Curated annotation (Swiss-Prot):
Catalytic reactions of this protein: CMP + ATP = CDP + ADP; dCMP + ATP = dCDP + ADP
Residues that hold ATP according to the record: G7, V8, A9, A10, S11, G12, K13, S14, S15
Main location: cytoplasm
Species this protein is from: Deinococcus deserti (strain DSM 17065 / CIP 109153 / LMG 22923 / VCD115)
Name assigned to this protein: Cytidylate kinase
Length: 207
């Protein structure tokens, strides 16, 4: 079975997907890490992130490998583990540009669809585009302020600056991030992580 968990930036997708995957005893797949890795490689190479052709050519010459694990995904480029570098502010600022490229999205989608179920997939369009026939779809949301306060606990930045960046990111991601018609929408704002995980696992179809 494939479970999809989509949602806005900093809505808790990765933590929730990891928790649901552990509860089910299956891997979880973070599509966002592939976009972040593509952004990081493009920035390291000095590429114009708005140049889809150059970015795609570079990615094909420097293949990425997603390692899906229940406790947390890792992304490799050759022997280099990119994972520790993927959540910097610089990557945050560039990832929406990269994710907006249709051919880059197709490149990511192909890698995800090549994975063998069962797994929990989290991202922006897992339930709408990548795995539209998944039997269990969820969409996480929360106010920009709540999301900014959560993210401020992970990095030394002012809540106001993070909130402004998230609002901008939401506007850029509107076309990519929308709940599937058959997705269950969960506002994570008033809930603990464990409560969100239970809310999802309690609604899963019988295996």
């Amino acid at each position: 079975m494939i479970v999809t968990i989509d949602g806005v930036a900093a809505s808790g997708k990765s933590s929730v997907a990891s928790g649901v995957a552990r509860a089910l005893g299956v891997p979880y797949v973070s599509s966002g890490l592939l976009y972040r890795a593509a952004t990081l490689l493009g920035q390291d190479a000095g590429l114009d992130l708005t140049d889809q052709a150059s970015l795609l050519a570079y990615l094909r010459d420097h293949p990425l490998r997603l390692e899906p694990l229940a406790e947390g995904n890792r992304v490799w480029q050759g022997q280099r583990d990119l994972t520790p570098e993927l959540h910097s502010s610089a990557v945050d600022q560039g990832v929406s540009q990269v994710a907006a490229h249709p051919e880059v999205r197709a490149w990511v989608d192909d890698q995800l669809r090549a994975l063998t179920p069962p797994f929990v997939a989290e991202g922006r369009d897992m339930g709408t585009n990548v795995f539209p026939h998944a039997p269990a779809k969820f969409y996480l949301t929360a106010s920009p302020r709540v999301r900014a306060e959560r993210r401020s606990r992970e990095r030394p930045e002012a809540v106001e600056a993070i909130e402004a960046a998230l609002i901008q990111r939401d506007a850029l991601d509107t076309t990519q991030s929308a709940p599937a018609p058959d997705a269950r929408v969960i506002d994570t704002g008033p809930l603990t992580l464990e409560q969100v995980i239970v809310a999802i696992t309690s609604q899963l179809p019988s295996q």
